[in-house]
Amino acid sequence: MAFTGKYETESEKNYDEFMKRLGLSSDRIEKGRNFKVISEIQQDGQNFTWSQHYPGGHSISNNFTIGKETEMETVGNKKFKVTVKMEGGKVVVDSANYHHTVEIVDGKLVEVSTFGGVIYERVSKKVA
């Protein structure tokens, strides 16, 4: 499937400001800076398992089906309900305060998140 694979962070834009906006502590932000987040995605049709592995052994795994409401968790351990959509080949998570898009561009996973007016971008290369 289009998204299935294991990806490692290659570049980030606006990391510190975005993580502060999410409410992460300075210590946690420091630990995560320049860390190569590993994203593992399994896609089976409209069903996804999306796991991200962070510094210190912290991992988040979200399961969702395109078009169905689900509860998701953020890196800041905040949970929210959302209906994940697929728009023009992009996975889109859109709630009152958070907007996130993910797409494959030239074989790379490109994620753009907006929270509280702050935009963060992470580009990851496929490693498996």
From Swiss-Prot:
Gene3D superfamilies in the cross-refs: 2.40.128.20
Subcellular location per the Swiss-Prot or TrEMBL entry: Cytoplasm; Membrane
GO MF terms, alphabetically ordered: fatty acid binding
The keyword Transit peptide is annotated on this UniProt entry: no
Signal peptide positions on this chain: none
Membrane topology: Peripheral membrane protein
Cellular compartments per GO CC: cytosol; membrane; nucleus
Disulfide bond annotation, renumbered to this chain: none
GO terms classed as biological process: fatty acid transport
UniProt-listed Pfam families: Lipocalin_7
Domain of life according to the entry: Eukaryota
Sequence positions bearing N-acetylalanine: 2
SUPFAM superfamilies, A to Z: Lipocalins (SSF50814)
Alphabetical UniProt keywords: Acetylation, Cytoplasm, Lipid-binding, Membrane, Transport
PANTHER family found in the cross-reference section: FATTY ACID BINDING PROTEIN
Biological function: Binds to bile acids and is involved in enterohepatic bile acid metabolism. Required for efficient apical to basolateral transport of conjugated bile acids in ileal enterocytes. Stimulates gastric acid and pepsinogen secretion.
Notes concerning its domains: Forms a beta-barrel structure that accommodates hydrophobic ligands in its interior. Can bind at least two ligands per molecule, however, the stoichiometry is debated.
Similarity comment: family membership: Belongs to the calycin superfamily. Fatty-acid binding protein (FABP) family.
Protein name (Swiss-Prot/TrEMBL): Gastrotropin
